Amino acid sequence: MLTQNILGNFKYTVICNMSDNKPIQLGLCCLNTILRAQKPPVFASRKMIIRSVEEQGIDALKEKVLQNLRDVVTMMDWNEQHGIKVFRLSSELFPHMSNPKVENYTYDFARDILHEIGERSNRYNQRLTFHPGQYNVVGSPKAEAFEQTCSDLKYHADVLDFISEGGGGKNAVMVVHGGGIYGDKEATINRWCE
């Protein structure tokens, strides 16, 4: 069932009665344009350029992360109110987490809010997904590309693990690009298997 709604200048359609037993569920991909247009804006992809991290310090970066995660909670609540049961999370939740050029930081400061996201995912039966970028190429013949891919996929998996600790495990999934075949399909498949 489709419902037409208007919020301010925005007109949107809600698909109602989403549930586990439906083969296809539509959802939001990283950004809610209605919430983003609010003042202050609600969005979960705040970033910092490396120079800003160096100048302002890792604590400024962590504050961006916490605001991203607080806004994920807000978006999940909005999704629940509007019958949306699938929500793709932005890969930018933790800027530079897998970037070797930026000082390492851990997830400890964000553990509680990640658990809260997991609890909401479970309570709302809201599927949370990550879809790491196309530059993640598990089958690449280049060692450096493969290592960076592993680092980035580990980042995404770690975030989903923390969400799962909060109860969202059955609803937390990662979708990975298969990538190219690099001129030798069998060798690429073997690299994937390794």
Where are these regions (language model features)?
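Eukaryote-skewed repeat-based solenoidal scaffolds used as protein-protein interaction platforms
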Residues: 147-194
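Conserved, mostly hydrophobic/aromatic
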Residues: 131
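Alpha/beta catalytic barrel-like cores
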Residues: 7-127, 136-139, 144-147, 158-165
